[in-house]
From Swiss-Prot:
This is UvrABC system protein A. The keyword Cell wall biogenesis/degradation does not apply. Pfam families: UvrA_DNA-bind, UvrA_inter. A zinc finger (C4-type) spans 256-283, 744-770. GO terms for biological process: nucleotide-excision repair; SOS response.
Length: 944
């Protein structure tokens, strides 16, 4: 191989990397592995990818660079042979409620085009195919106007489009038209006055073709006008009754012969819920509406109205408040008793309380000195909060009202986001919303089995080829269970990453360096093989893949492995071993090699816990693909929830169980609309539910392991009790870098100063006043055992454990951090530099320190994300310690090392999406392994 066939990195020192030198073969599948925090991401993303991105951005103009964000040069001497780099990380970046799987993959765009080309409109009422009207039928429709009506015949040429439209207006003027109707106003073209339209606003323009008085003699004139209007309006003509304002729309394109349903021109924008042309006008294309929620307005049905059952009248009941007097008049008019519990009211009474009177009511409003008689319809509590929410200009009032509102499925489009015209168009009996509601696998099957005429096949061959190609890529990366209308913001990090991966495969780029972050996360072993084939395919077409990965199957399928370590943090950052799987196994100091060879492994427990004997039982769980499911959680055990991707694991635990227990603990069952189960039993056995994720332990660089675990409070207490500190009157707050007093004010306790570079990325330099120590000179003079507070923050957990050996409270907290494998991290290390696995273990350590009641339920969703097999062994020790204290731990997991260590498994399936949502097996890992239809059981047999 020549020099250009390799990527050469020299002197990489980003984060904990120790002057790394490395040569990687190009056009290969390269795996970066090592313990959590060893420096894998620092090398792959922060060095190689960032340098590739920086070189690309630097090639652009300074004007373009300001829109792309700053790119600082990684701390590396040189990188040679670098190709254009694309990063695909585990991040859900689409927070827009309008983004769906279909839109982010652009598959929905192809579907819109397909429906615009070969879709057939059907009348939603009569279910018959819609055909265009002839001129004769249009004239017959016009004659239905009253005799001698003054009519304007209009030809729509622009509908809700941005722009000045100057060229069109000038063209129409030269063609002899005298008037236009612009945004519902008649404008003369005969005047010399120029028509100026705002280019940033949407406009509608109709040509005034003719103005006539309707009678028998005008039929010929009407016919000629209609012909002209249809020509310019592309098959659409509007007829307006000047006196009544009534407008009839006729189409030579599409209209129901049995009714008044008219189809606009079928084009791609009709099927977009982001376009005013296609969106449901009621919910503006969101599919949901914010409306008053009766369960929030009346949270306690056992109270009467007089006792304050209705929250918005809670403080004004029986007062002189005008709104209360109006509402009381409503109650009196219908004879509703305000002194009985709300639950005892009839349904008709509740409807009146919700939506008010249908007719006008006579009532009297009393003030301190006067009485006023009024007659009007009185609104109900739901109407009231919705009106106030829309009318108020006060953000405070709007926030207060929003407490009593929830998102409900739009009652007009039923959540489809589209208007009735878009939903009327069908292919093979399905409209675009119905096809988007199918799983990707089903959409693929529908696409390749379309029943088309020769003409339709000819005009859609390339379109269907592109559509099925993109769908097949999503199937290949294990996302066949997703639906196209799934909200993008609801995707897990692994799902979002694999969607971007599928998009890149579809681009067919070659000569690219892809950097991926654990693409196997969230994938069942059953689906992992397809993912590996996809990665190999990307390599085969001429790309280099650097994949940060811990999955053994992926490592064994790779061409080259880089093992980084030997441990984590300051004890990592070096290349331990590189080469083939065999090369890694042969290396005596490679921890990865020991696990690959089987020398080290996470052993299967010799026995399973029997638990406390108590259970939580949920009956009738229904959410997403889970329908009327009954299940139980045995307490005092380590429980694993398993199943193929999309089988319903997260739905069952995060959306059903967690929701039910949180409301049960809070005794809050007011959100009946969100109640996705029929019954829950055993709540008395749980007094606390804790979800532990891999999210950062703090949002700012100021947060660190010492502050999160409250360890820093104890350390500051120790320093405040030093004799010198007492003599100076220093309190505990003096040793905080977050508040004025003891911190360095030049850098505000950051230790570094940001310098704005405008078109270049911002530069951070060490504060020259405190030399990066964060504190002022007076504070640093206070020493405990010859160390300042800054020196202590710079210690690793292991060093601090020896330093504070005689301080029991501090020692216990440090020992717990050491026990979970975090002895290498520094006490003052910024939380933003911790990996997901490290952040999770800091959280677990803080919970280990708390006294157990035996009634705590811990829930973890894929806790092994980012963890090496050695890290998994540490995680298992921590989780087992929590269970040994009498608490219950539930993990949603695919990792077999974790699954085989569980006491009890709940395996869902058999497939994903609509093919999942059922409990396939429950019991110990040994019992599940015997269930033939369990995919998890099939793989468990190999490791038990």
């Amino acid at each position: 191989m020549s020099k250009v066939d390799f990527l050469h990195i020299k002197g990489a020192r980003e984060n904990n990397l120790k002057n790394v030198e490395l040569t990687i073969p190009k056009n290969k599948l390269v795996i970066f592995t090592g313990l959590s925090g060893s420096g894998k991401s620092s090398l792959a993303f922060n060095t190689i990818y960032e340098e590739g991105r920086r070189r690309y951005v630097d090639s652009l103009s300074s004007y373009a660079r300001q829109f792309l964000g700053g790119t600082s040069k990684p701390d590396v001497d040189s990188i040679e042979g670098l190709s254009p780099a694309i990063s695909i990380e585990q991040k859900t970046t689409h927070n827009n409620p309008r983004s769906t799987v279909g839109t982010v993959t652009e598959i929905y765009d192809y579907l819109r085009l397909l429906y615009a080309r070969i879709g057939k409109p059907f009348c939603p009422k009569h279910k018959i195919k819609i055909e265009g009207k002839t001129t004769k039928l249009i004239i017959e429709g016009i004659v239905d106007f009253p005799k001698n009506s003054k009519l304007i015949i209009l030809s729509p040429v622009v509908e809700l489009e941005k722009g000045t439209h100057q060229k069109l207006i000038a063209k129409l003027k030269t063609e002899g038209f005298l008037r236009l109707k612009i945004n519902n106003e008649i404008v003369s073209l005969s005047d010399d006055k120029e028509i100026n339209l705002d280019k940033n606003k949407r406009h509608s323009i109709d040509i005034v073709v003719d103005r006539i008085v309707l009678n028998e003699e005008k039929k010929l004139e009407i016919s000629e006008a209609i012909s002209i209007a249809l020509e310019y309006g592309k098959g659409i003509v509007k007829v307006e009754n000047v006196e009544t304002g009534e407008i009839k729309i006729f189409s030579s394109n599409h209209s129901c012969p049995k009714g008044d349903f008219e189809m606009p021109k079928i084009e791609t924008r009709l099927f977009s819920f982001n376009s005013p042309y296609g969106m449901c006008q009621n919910c503006k294309g969101l599919g949901v509406q914010l409306r008053g929620d009766y369960n929030l307005l009346v949270p306690d049905q056992n109270l009467s109205i007089s006792e304050g059952a209705i929250k918005i009248f809670e403080s004004t009941v029986n007062s002189s408040n005008q709104e209360w007097q109006e509402f009381e008049a409503l109650l009196n008019y219908y004879g509703i008793d305000k002194n009985i519990p709300m639950r005892k009211l009839s349904e008709s009474d509740r409807q009146i309380i919700k939506y008010g009177s249908k007719e006008e009511i006579d009532y009297i409003i009393k003030s301190q000195s006067n009485k006023f008689k009024r007659t009007k319809r009185i609104e109900g509590i739901i109407d009231k909060v919705e009106r106030k929410y829309l009318e108020t200009s006060s953000e405070g009032i709007r926030t207060w009202i929003k407490r009593y509102m929830s998102e409900f499925i739009c009652n007009m489009c039923k959540g489809s986001r589209l208007n009735e015209h878009a939903l009327a168009v069908k292919i093979n009996g399905l409209n675009i919303w119905e096809i988007s509601s199918l799983s990707i696998n089903d959409v693929y099957e529908q696409s390749i089995n379309l029943n088309l005429s020769d003409y339709e096949r000819e005009i859609t061959t390339l379109l269907i080829s592109e559509l099925t190609s993109r769908l097949s890529f999503l199937v290949d990366v294990g996302l066949d269970y997703l639906t196209l209308n799934r909200m993008a913001e609801s995707l897990s990090g692994g799902e979002a990453q694999r969607i971007r991966l599928a998009t890149q495969i579809g681009s067919n780029l070659t000569g690219v360096l892809y950097v991926l972050d654990e693409p196997s996360i969230g994938l069942h072993q059953k689906d992992n093989e397809r993912l590996i084939k996809t990665l190999r395919k990307m390599v085969e077409i001429g790309n280099t893949l650097i994949v940060v990965e811990h999955d053994e199957d992926t490592m064994r399928a790779s061409d080259f492995i880089v093992d980084i370590g030997p441990k984590a943090g300051s004890h990592g950052g070096e290349i331990v071993a590189l080469g083939s799987v065999e090369d890694i196994i042969k290396n005596p100091i490679s921890i990865t090699g020991k696990y690959l060879s089987g020398e080290w492994q996470n052993a299967t427990p010799k026995s399973r816990r029997s638990g406390s004997g108590n259970v939580i039982k949920i009956t009738g769980a229904s959410q997403n693909n889970i329908k009327k499911l009954d299940f139980k959680i045995p307490l005092g055990k380590f429980i694993g929830v398993t199943g193929v991707s999309g089988s319903g694991k997260s739905t069952l635990i995060n959306q059903v169980l967690v929701n039910a227990i949180e409301k049960g603990i809070a005794r809050d069952f007011s959100h009946d609309k969100n109640k996705n189960y029929e019954k829950i039993e055993g709540l008395l056995y749980i007094d606390k539910l804790i979800k532990i994720s891999q999210s950062p332990i703090g949002r700012t660089p100021r947060s660190n392991p010492a502050t999160y675990s409250s360890l820093f409070d104890d350390i500051r207490e120790i320093f405040s009790n030093v004799p010198e500190a007492k003599a100076r009157g220093y309190q505990k707050g003096r040793f905080s870098f977050n508040v004025p007093g003891g911190r360095c004010e030049k850098c505000s306790g950051d230790g570094s100063i940001k310098i704005e570079m405008f078109f270049l990325p911002n530069v951070y330099i060490t504060c020259d006043h405190c030399d990066g120590k964060r504190y002022n000179e007076e504070t640093l003079q206070i020493k405990y055992r010859s160390k300042s507070i800054s020196d202590v923050l710079d210690m690793t957990v292991s060093d601090a454990l020896a330093f504070f050996e005689n301080r029991l409270i501090v020692k216990n907290k440090l020992q717990t951090l050491e026990d979970v494998g975090l002895g290498y991290i520094k006490l003052g290390q910024s939380s933003t530099t911790l990996s997901g696995g490290e952040a999770q273990r800091v959280k677990l350590a803080s919970h280990l320190l708390k006294k157990s009641t035996g009634k705590t339920l811990y829930v973890l969703d894929e806790p092994t994300t980012g963890l090496h097999s050695h890290d998994v062994s540490l995680l298992l020790k921590v989780l087992n310690r929590l269970v040994d204290k009498g608490d219950t731990v539930i993990v949603i997991e695919h990792n077999l090392d974790v699954i085989k260590n569980c006491d009890y498994l709940i395996d869902l399936g058999p497939g994903g999406g609509v093919n999942g949502g059922k409990i396939i097996a429950t019991g110990t890992p040994e019992q599940v392994a015997q269930i033939e239809k369990s995919y998890t059981g099939e793989f468990l047999k190999r490791v038990l």
